[in-house]
Structure formats: C-alpha cells, structure tokens
Design a protein with these regions (language model features):
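Short, low-complexity, Pro/Ser/Thr/Gly-rich segments in the mature regions of secreted, periplasmic
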Residues: 169-187
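An ectodomain-focused feature that recognizes extracytoplasmic/extracellular
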Residues: 12-120
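Small side chains
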Residues: 9, 35-39, 144-146, 170
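Bacterial N-terminal signal peptides
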Residues: 1-7
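Acidic, glycine-rich flexible loop segments
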Residues: 96-172
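Generic "edge-of-domain/loop-turn" microfeature
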Residues: 46, 78, 131, 151-153, ...
Length: 187
C-alpha cells in the first residue's frame, strides 16, 4: 500500500537548521533516532502503543485529494497485534505548522482481513503539527499529536476501534523523486 495523507497547513515555518538525513533506516523510523508512535486504542483492539524509533518503520508523502500528507507507522518484526497505522492529515503544506485539522485514520491488523477506517477526516483531529527540515531536499521530521472522538469502523463486519489519543514523530518526503525509501506494504 503506497502512502498519502491529507493536508493541514497554516502559518509559515520558522527558520530552522536542517537535521539529519531523513531517509528511514531498516532498523528505525528516523536516522536521527527520535521517531516514535504512541496511541491508546479501545474496542475491537484494546492496546496501548508505545513504539520507539528503533524497530519502527515510518514514511510519509503528500497526497492530492484532499490535499495534505499521509504518514504510516509499522513495527518491524510485527508484534501482537501486528498493526499498521496510516494517518491522512488534511491541509498540511510543506514545512508549515498546523493546528486543529482533520485526520483520516486507518488501522490494519497485518496478516488478517481486519481493517478499520474513519472514512474521512471528521472523526479525528490533530491538535498540533510541526515540521523540521532534514538534510535531504523536500524531507521533514513531522511531529503531531491528536485525538479521535469517534471510532474507526471495520471495513468488513461491525467491529470498531477508538484511537482516543495519538502522537508521533515521523518522516514526510515532499519530493518523492529524491526518496530512496521503498513503499510500505501491508502483509
């Protein structure tokens, strides 16, 4: 599954010094070592997610409809449950911070047919989002926190998952031609 997310953008970014190279490594989310995903899930999946940089794969790219970004997070080597999170954040623009913007959230239980989605960006919100440029052109460390007020419903069946809170730091590459990261796929 290729990545794409909804956009957030608001004010112009503050001047900043580029960080380390953005390309995710095979052993972690960000080369700088400060990527992560934290989330609280209830319902059909009851879990507290606390994935540090090491062992977490993340990637992100811009999306067109609606404009924004898409970021995904996955633990290398799986886990119980083996989850893939995809955040489509509306209104995000390259290098700009964002506040109070909609999120389309998909949670996939890898190796099964269990897929949960909010089917739009009205059920989850990013409170705040910040971007810092990395050395590779068009690449940014994106840090965000937010919440969902309604659950993501099962694509098949009647189950639902509420991701009550989430926060993450991951990679978005706006210039996909320069990215050497392989697309993340569902198993």
């Amino acid at each position: 599954m290729s990545l794409s997310t909804a956009a957030l953008g608001i004010a112009a970014p503050p001047p900043s010094v580029p960080l380390e190279t953005p390309a995710a490594t095979s052993t972690g989310c960000l080369e700088s070592g400060d990527g992560y995903l934290r989330a609280n899930l209830g319902g059909a999946i009851d879990a507290t997610i606390d994935w540090p940089n090491s062992g977490t794969r993340c990637q992100g790219e811009p999306k067109d409809e609606p404009p924004g970004v898409r970021l995904s997070f996955q633990r290398l080597g799986g886990g119980a449950p083996d989850l893939l999170f995809v955040f489509g954040i509306t209104g995000v623009r390259e290098g700009r911070p964002a506040r109070a913007t909609g999120v389309n959230l998909t949670v996939i239980v890898q190796g099964t047919n269990r897929i949960y989605g909010t089917l739009g960006d009205s059920r989850c919100t990013v409170d705040s989002l910040a971007q810092r440029p990395l050395k590779a052109r068009g690449s940014y460390r994106v840090e965000a926190r937010g919440f969902c007020t309604q659950p993501a419903h099962a694509v098949r069946g009647n189950d639902a998952v509420l991701v009550s809170t989430f926060e993450f730091a991951g990679l978005v590459t706006y210039d996909a031609q320069d990215s050497d990261a392989a697309p993340m796929t569902s198993r």
